[in-house]
Design a protein with these regions (language model features):
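N-terminal mature ectodomain segment of secretory-pathway/periplasmic proteins
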Residues: 7-11, 15-90
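Short hydrophobic alpha-helical segments that form membrane-spanning helices or hydrophobic packing faces
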Residues: 27, 157-158
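N-terminal export leaders
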Residues: 1-3
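Solvent-exposed helix/loop surface patches that form functional interfaces
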Residues: 8, 73-157
Length: 158
């Protein structure tokens, strides 16, 4: 999969809760289609009256080569509590260390950083908040027409 053809150099989203913007999520791509780096950042803050009730900061850097995840470094801070996830390719497996321990998995495997279309065909993902291997069921739903600026296109819902 070539993220540069799909997204260019980056994709960015505003995050809303109850109609109010509470943060942002941005994913940046650098390198070449066969060997690239993906940096994802998300910052959320839910304010109640005069204080912040919930604060979430997330940063991940993933190295991809020839369509496979080679490494992943994630740091997360939720309400001041920090955690990390580290994954490295070793002997045709990915070794993952997270807050609940270590695990190993054979590729293909996808982290939950929400950009790689290949994840729709998988049933296990790397939870980038915990490092756990989570079982998932991704169901194909209907298509819908979306408009972005002056462009209109069909999008597949899952």
């Amino acid at each position: 999969m070539n993220p540069f053809e799909l997204y260019g150099g980056s994709i960015a989203f505003s995050v809303f809760r109850n109609g109010k913007k509470i943060g942002s999520h941005e994913v940046n791509f650098k390198g070449k289609p066969e060997n690239f780096t993906v940096k994802a950042e998300c910052r959320l803050a839910v304010n109640l009256l005069f204080f912040t009730a919930y604060k979430f900061e997330y940063s991940s850097v993933a190295q991809w080569s020839e369509g496979a995840l080679n490494s992943l470094d994630v740091s997360t801070t939720i309400n001041g509590i920090k955690s990390s996830v580290i994954a490295r390719s070793e002997n045709n497996e990915l070794s993952i260390t997270g807050k609940n321990g270590k695990s190993r998995v054979k590729p293909p495997i996808f982290p939950t950083d929400h950009w790689h279309f290949g994840v729709v065909n998988e049933n296990i993902v790397i939870n980038t908040l915990t490092g756990d291997l989570n079982k998932v069921v991704i169901l194909r739903k209907n298509q819908e027409r979306l408009t972005c600026g002056s462009r209109s296109f069909l999008a597949q819902r899952y």
